Amino acid sequence: MTRDELHAAAMALPGAHMDVQWGDDHVYKVAGKMFAATDGAYSNLSFKATDIAFEALTEAGRGRPAPYMARAKWVVLDDLAAQDAAEVADWVRTAH
């Protein structure tokens, strides 16, 4: 998934906006709550996953528990460019 594809998918969701926080992180929010975040280079993506997606992604090694956020079932995908755009867009929609 490219930077533009991620940004378009996240911003297409109702009420979504993006803030730059913590230096250069791009944080996608709705109603003041985060649902996805990426570094400024869009090299990785963190998002709130369902219980099933969290288990599947982390157990298969496709993602890892997000630092400080794993208890809330956040996942990090370390290589966003290698991810299928449609699949990531679906995870972002679900996180929203």
Q: What is each of the regions a protein language model found here?
A:
Residues 1-96:
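Charge-dense, helix-prone N-terminal extensions
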